[in-house]
A protein has these predicted regions:
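Bacterial N-terminal signal peptides
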Residues: 11-24
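A short, well-structured edge-of-sheet supersecondary motif
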Residues: 61-92, 123, 330-333
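Active-site SXXK
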Residues: 80, 97-123, 151, 207-211, ...
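Catalytic-site signature segments of enzymes, centered on catalytic residues
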Residues: 93-94, 163-252
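Active-site helix/loop module of the DD-peptidase/beta-lactamase fold
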Residues: 98, 117-158, 186, 215-251, ...
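Active-site-proximal alpha-helical segments within enzyme catalytic domains
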Residues: 203-210, 249-272, 321-338, 350
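Active-site Gly/Thr loop motif
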Residues: 235-237, 281-335
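Peripheral terminal and inter-domain segments
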Residues: 366-520
């Protein structure tokens, strides 16, 4: 499946972490015949799985299985109540999480609201007509024919590269120009509009620009008033607007897992919230049915993925961010994670694993043994297991507290220092900036040396968690995360006298080599 999000070389590392706990939900017949909902606008009600026809013992096994896939959280709602709420160490509850391309599905929801409000006149309107002030070369009949619906279905026909996130790809070049909307619409056409599915994060960027143009607000401002406010979503953050005032519609949104579940619950309840039709039920139906055949056996529509044969549809983001809606089971499931692109939990298996816990639409008898197993699984997930640390060499005395200065590099790292002897070991990096008033920027974090992540006090970029270990007598590995970000970062430092070679890698696929020398 195409990888949502972007992978630019980063200096921050990314993280996710700790703690788990369990709960459960109420009772009903399936979303299509659900009784009056117990709306979770202020807080999610919780209950035991058995009260809502699910087996705690099966969910306990699911918590353990999902934990093997480097997830940060797993949440399941049935009949409007949380029946499972687990967090994997070192991730913590209530931390806002980068949801990557789940952003697209939220942007779709905002498009539906703009149509409901009469601010956008419908999905069949030609897109280029609404940007007549843009300088768009080579406008042919195919480009003139692109509609809002085709942007929503990833069938715009615009030629696009979005796979490896290398500098030559359109997705990377888009972020380097001042007018990204014009950039997307200026790309050549590879197919007639509507003819073929092709994943293109430029499509939702143009939709976000339409939100600006038609509502007078950027997507985040519009969402706070029209979507997040009514649903009780309070955790949201959403990147920065570009020079045109447009928020990225393809990525950049952050939500806590409970707020992700609210988005899914809106769709489970056919667009209704507290008796008000927030989005048309037909919009939900189209996402659920998946009108457009996509990749890997999935379907796609309205910026949502679907498996129609399983009656499952989902918002998905890179590194395993997920809002899964199972209408016939009256279930919403949420996952956040830090997985590499080749490590996704198989979606069909996940649907089957969740469904296997459902035994009835009504309550089951209490199950003390199952409840105990589930409680233990959630507690175990929240407890970090120490990793190996290696033997501390004599070299530590020579490098600890010393700063190493680096030649020009892709990460713009100027200096790197490790303090491994202090009672509170820490690392420190300085990087170059393009700001003449502030030419360097400093990052630092407390470092766990006993196989456990240690958390630094919250910074403006989040909560840093780091741990390090010796691979051999001259090689030290530092793993760094920022809780709630969907990437992890690994720095491997190989020391040789006064010199150091640093190998950098993150889960976005960025890699770099840095060469430094000890400062006098």
């Amino acid at each position: 499946m195409p990888r949502p999000g972007r992978a630019t070389a980063k200096i921050l590392a990314l993280i996710a972490c700790l703690q788990c706990f369990v709960v459960s939900g109420s009772l009903a017949a399936g979303a299509d015949q659900a009784p009056e909902a117990d709306w979770p606008t202020r807080a999610w009600p919780v209950s035991s799985p058995e009260q809502h026809g699910m087996k705690s013992g099966v969910l306990a096994r699911l918590v353990e299985t999902v934990g093997g896939y480097k997830q940060n959280s797993l949440l399941i709602v049935r009949h409007g109540k949380i029946v499972l709420d687990a967090y994997y160490a070192p991730y913590l509850p209530n931390i806002t999480h980068d949801v990557r391309s789940v952003t697209k599905s939220v942007l779709s929801t905002l498009t539906a609201i703009a149509i409901r409000n009469g601010q956008l006149d419908g999905v069949e309107h030609p897109v280029v007509d609404m940007f007549s002030d843009k300088q768009i070369p080579d406008i042919d009949d195919n480009k003139k024919a692109i509609t809002v619906q085709q942007l929503l279905d990833m069938t715009s026909g615009i030629a696009w590269q979005e796979k490896s996130f290398t500098p030559d790809e359109a997705i990377v070049r888009m972020y380097q120009v001042p007018d990204r909307t014009a950039f997307v619409l200026s790309q050549p056409m590879s197919d007639a509009p509507g003819a073929k599915f092709y994943y293109n994060s430029g499509n939702p960027y143009v939709l976000s620009a339409l939100i600006n143009r038609k509502t007078g607000q950027n997507a985040f401002e519009f969402a706070k008033k029209e979507l997040f406010g009514p649903l009780g979503i309070t955790s949201a953050g959403w990147g920065r607007a570009d020079s045109q005032g447009v928020i990225d519609g393809g990525a950049g949104l952050s939500l806590a897992p409970h707020d992700m579940a609210r988005i899914g619950y809106l769709y489970l309840r056919n667009g209704i919230w507290e008796g008000k039709q927030i989005i048309p039920s037909s919009w939900v139906d189209r996402a659920r049915e998946g009108k457009t055949p996509a990749t890997f056996g999935f379907h796609y529509a309205n910026l949502w993925w679907s498996l129609p044969e399983m009656d499952a549809f989902m918002a998905q983001g890179r590194h395993s961010q997920l809002i899964l809606v199972l209408p016939k089971l009256d279930i919403v499931a949420v996952m956040t994670g830090i997985l590499r692109d080749d490590q996704f939990y198989p979606m069909r298996r996940l649907v089957d694993d969740i469904a296997s816990a459902v035994k009835s639409d009504g309550p089951l008898p209490p199950d003390a043994v199952g409840a105990s197993l589930l409680e233990a699984s959630v507690r175990e997930a929240a407890t970090e297991r120490p990793s190996s640390v290696g033997i501390t060499p004599e070299l530590v005395k020579q490098i600890s507290g010393k700063a190493y200065q680096f030649s020009a590099n892709a990460l713009k790292v100027k200096t790197f220092a490790l303090n491994l002897i202090d009672p509170d070991p820490f690392w420190e990096i300085t990087t170059e900036t393009e700001n003449a008033d502030r030419p360097t920027r400093r990052f630092s974090g407390i470092l766990g040396l006993h196989g456990i992540f240690r958390m630094s006090p919250p910074a403006n970029y989040g909560i840093n968690a780091s741990k390090g270990r010796w691979l051999d007598e001259r090689t030290f590995a530092l793993e760094r995360r920022i809780l709630g970000h969907s990437e992890t970062q690994l720095w491997v430092l190989a020391f040789d006298g006064n010199k150091v070679e640093v190998s950098f890698e993150d889960t976005d696929g960025s890699k770099a080599k840095l060469y430094g020398e000890k400062k006098d």
